[in-house]
Amino acid sequence: MRRIAVTGAAGRMGKTLIEAVQQTGGVAGLTAAIDRPDSTLVGADAGELAAIGRLGVPLTGDVARAVDEFDVLIDFTHPSVTLKNLDVCRRAGKAMVIGTTGFSPEEKERLAAAAREIPIVFAANFSVGVNLCLKLLDTAARVLGDDVDIEIIEAHHRHKVDAPSGTALRMGEVVAEALGRDLQKVAVYGREGQTGARPRETIGFATVRAGDVVGDHTVLFAADGERVEITHKASSRMTFAKGAVRAALWLDEKPAGLYDMQDVLGLI
């Protein structure tokens, strides 16, 4: 049995991950659940927190104390928290599945450095559907080339703290790479006032934060006379949780390295 730990276990995504781990039919099991050290829920049963029944796994506030209890840590938290957990896992030789978004380029370099010592799956989105969309976006960009205007529109719930979403940025990276462009130079994040005519080479991003939207992403390829839209809409966090658990199982026996969901799904 693959021993899995979940950090951020008392949050919305953490609870969903706990449920997803327990749906593997015994292939994997939750052996540790971690949240903030100051959480009033420390000591509570992880299964009861996730409303799936008692599991006998108490919530702890310290990854280091639980590090001997798991083979792989699934982390959907905050960059600062993830990087602390990364240091613990690197020293202990534990694998990680990272779904945290909002990393700076320098922080991503720290992930890459740690991946020289431990296996890590790092992805902006663990949905199978989104990763299929990334493959389709690469194809669409190469076929449509420089004859289209490209816009990326994403929507999430009011509680999401980073914008644009990591998934939207990854979509932009895929499209830019396919077209031989540098996303940092061509990205336009929102528009206001007298912007002038739209330069063809730019890739625009528009962000919506409202209600309880789990995650909607649309990439628009607009030409004169026609347009192509590639859209993914998530209706449940379980979509991401199942993908993360799939990645955790896939990492078994994998050598050190930085992988993503394209590797897990065999799309590369």
From Swiss-Prot:
Alphabetized UniProt keyword annotations: Amino-acid biosynthesis, Cytoplasm, Diaminopimelate biosynthesis, Lysine biosynthesis, NAD, NADP, Oxidoreductase
PROSITE patterns with a match to the protein in the record: DAPB (PS01298)
Claim: Membrane is one of the keywords in the record: no
Record field: catalytic activity: (S)-2,3,4,5-tetrahydrodipicolinate + NAD(+) + H2O = (2S,4S)-4-hydroxy-2,3,4,5-tetrahydrodipicolinate + NADH + H(+); (S)-2,3,4,5-tetrahydrodipicolinate + NADP(+) + H2O = (2S,4S)-4-hydroxy-2,3,4,5-tetrahydrodipicolinate + NADPH + H(+)
Residues involved in (S)-2,3,4,5-tetrahydrodipicolinate binding: H157, G166, T167
Residue sites binding NAD(+) per the record: G8, A9, A10, G11, R12, M13, D35, G99, T100, T101, A123, A124, N125, F126
Pathway(s) this gene product operates in, as recorded in its UniProt entry: Amino-acid biosynthesis; L-lysine biosynthesis via DAP pathway; (S)-tetrahydrodipicolinate from L-aspartate: step 4/4
GO BP annotations, alphabetical order: diaminopimelate biosynthetic process; lysine biosynthetic process via diaminopimelate
Protein residues bound to NADP(+): R36
Cellular-component GO terms for this entry: cytosol
Gene Ontology MF, one: NAD binding
Coiled-coil zones: none
Annotated family: Belongs to the DapB family.
Functional note: Catalyzes the conversion of 4-hydroxy-tetrahydrodipicolinate (HTPA) to tetrahydrodipicolinate.
Name this polypeptide is given: 4-hydroxy-tetrahydrodipicolinate reductase
Organism of this sequence: Stutzerimonas stutzeri (strain A1501)
